[in-house]
A protein has these predicted regions:
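A contiguous strand-loop segment
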Residues: 20-117, 137-301
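Substrate-recognition/cap regions that form aromatic- and gly/pro-loop-enriched pockets
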Residues: 330-468
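Accessory, solvent-exposed terminal regions and/or long lumenal/extracellular loops of proteins
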Residues: 264-352, 356-358, 463-464
Length: 550
């Protein structure tokens, strides 16, 4: 019997609560017909990486050993006859799966299950040619071997369709999971941010006898026992027609709306009438009695570009009622970043909180997955990727048709405990951690470098994709691998240049003039503190710093 140890696509550690964000765009909602899904993978204390698993045809009787990214005993399961190549979280057929954790009812976690959510995603990508197939593969695997993570939402997408799937286990000693998956209408957008969001869903009149799942007009799928199990556990007692998955398995509370649904709200607000979305502000305060909940999806006012989505991944509620740069807690440099924890107490015991935006310093990696049915798979699927906070990096195009990963993104070069200039994670963090403490003074230099790179990639990709049509499959794989490595090297060089600029330009808390990424001759200036901070200092210190009249 042949055995293979499964290599995970990313190295992960346990992440903090309220971690990870997904934005999802249907093909008719995007400007060019792309299906788009994104992933900010957030959590302190881990460095992400980009992995690659090669395609393969496997012998009968071949086994693979599942080893959870959290450690523990390895379990053997039969290998599939054929497995697809996977780059990051997209396979060679342009199928992508991303996730956010919403936990849900703690008693439903099954520690004896063999599949955690990340291993489940990885195996499904290796075995699925479409999003629909991936959903059914995930269901089959947890039914057979058990599921040991908490409640999860998955965006399961291919070049034609985007699906959202919510899944939670059945508790200790019980294999399987209860789940619902809904197809995102092609002309809509949606988002997930660590809360369960599917409530009522279309249902069949009579469940099939031989299958463990139901399909409703190709737009909804769900486990056959999703309602009966909730009744068994005492989570629901009403009629089937009024059943809400979220209310049964992942009920809302203040944290779920303010730290999670607020991120969805901000994304929607970018793409529809802001005033209409501001009507949901009472919901973000958990005032459920006076305000409706957010819709599951919306139709954007105008079609969405992939660059718009990159910008959305960097959101800190700027320009909204939740703007993090506009009060004293933003500090002297109008920072949208805050230290942990999310919840804290004042010296008098008053309970307080801070906002939790889409863009955050604890991101280990960020990606925007773009699937295009109008291009051949190897070049149609591209993941815009980098390691660290989306706000502080440039997205590097990584084609799904490559055959190896660029060195700076490899796991062995991104050790959380050892700085290296050859590590994308550490080069991006090196720059970000210079900018964080003096945000308003330095962010303009970073945005300039970010835009320069992403503009270049956007233009160069047009040439790459035009040339791809004339190449054989082998030539195309080599070409895309080389171009992806060149793109990554360009990012690393530009970020090294940016780091050197920041220390020279902003040395000793002044600001020297610069042009085209280099310091120029001229008189330095001293950047002013944020007005809100100055006013707060004046109010707090009284007459101490008031200058006398002259």
């Amino acid at each position: 019997m042949k055995r293979i140890i499964l290599t995970l696509i990313f190295s992960l550690a346990a992440t903090a609560g309220y971690a990870c964000t997904n934005l999802i765009v249907g093909k008719a909602a995007s400007k060019d017909g792309s299906v788009i899904c994104t992933y900010n993978c957030d959590g302190f204390g881990f460095s992400g990486s980009l992995g690659y698993s090669a395609p393969g045809r496997h012998e009968k009787g071949e086994m693979i050993a599942l080893r959870s990214w959290g450690g523990g005993e390895a379990h053997l399961i039969p290998q599939a006859e054929y497995t697809y190549a996977v780059v990051g979280l997209m396979n060679e057929k342009q199928v992508s799966i991303v996730e956010t954790t919403w936990d849900g009812r703690s008693e439903l976690r099954n520690p004896e299950g063999w599949f955690d959510y990340f291993t489940l995603m990885n195996i499904a990508l290796q075995r699925s040619a479409t999003a629909r197939e991936a959903i059914l593969v995930m269901d089959a695997l947890v039914q057979e071997y058990g599921y040991n993570s908490t409640g999860e939402s998955f965006a399961v997408c291919d070049k034609d369709e985007a699906w959202i799937m919510e899944l939670i286990g059945k508790g200790p000693g019980r294999k399987g999971a209860v789940w619902v998956a809904r197809r995102l209408p092609d002309d809509c957008i949606t988002a997930y941010a660590n809360s369960s969001r599917i409530r009522r869903f279309p249902q069949v009149r009579k469940a099939p006898k031989k299958l463990g799942y139901c399909v409703v007009e190709g737009e909804c799928m769900y486990s056959k026992d999703v309602i009966s199990f909730a009744r068994e556990m005492g989570y629901y007692s009403g009629p089937d027609s009024e059943f809400s998955f979220r209310e049964a398995y992942g009920p809302l509370n203040f944290g779920k709306v303010r730290y999670c649904e607020a991120r969805v709200w901000s994304f929607f607000r970018h793409h529809t009438d802001p005033a209409a979305m501001d009507a949901y502000l009472p919901f973000l305060e958990a005032r459920f009695d006076v305000c409706d909940e957010l819709p599951l999806w919306i139709r954007p006012d105008s079609k969405v570009d992939v660059r718009d989505i990159m910008s959305d991944m960097r959101d800190h509620y700027e320009g909204t009622a939740l703007d993090m740069t506009a009060d004293m807690s933003a500090g002297p440099w109008a920072s949208p970043y805050r230290n942990q924890p999310v919840n804290f107490e004042a010296s008098d015991g008053t309970k307080m909180f801070r906002e939790r935006p889409i863009g955050c310093q604890q991101s280990g990696m960020t990606m925007v997955c773009r699937m295009r049915s109008f291009l051949p798979d190897p070049v149609g699927g591209v993941t815009y990727f980098n390691l660290d906070d989306a706000s502080m990096v440039a997205y590097v195009p990584v084609y799904c048709g490559i055959s190896s990963v660029p060195e700076p993104f490899r796991r062995e070069n991104n050790d959380i405990n050892e700085f290296s200039t050859g590590s994308a994670f550490w080069m991006c963090n090196f720059v970000a951690n210079m900018v964080y403490p003096r945000y308003s003074a330095m962010i303009g230099d970073l945005r300039e470098a970010q835009k320069e790179l992403e503009d270049f990639y956007e233009q160069d990709q047009k040439e790459v994709e035009a040339r791809a049509a004339g190449l054989t499959r082998g030539e195309l794989s080599d070409y895309l691998t080389r171009k992806t490595s060149e793109y990554t090297a360009r990012m690393m060089a530009r970020w090294d240049k940016l780091a050197r600029l920041l220390i020279v330009k902003h040395n000793d808390q002044i600001m020297r003039p610069s042009e085209n990424g280099a310091v120029t001759r001229g008189r330095h200036t001293s950047p002013a503190y944020a007005p809100a901070f100055i006013d707060a200092v004046k109010a707090h210190t009284g007459p101490r710093y008031l200058r006398p009249a002259e």
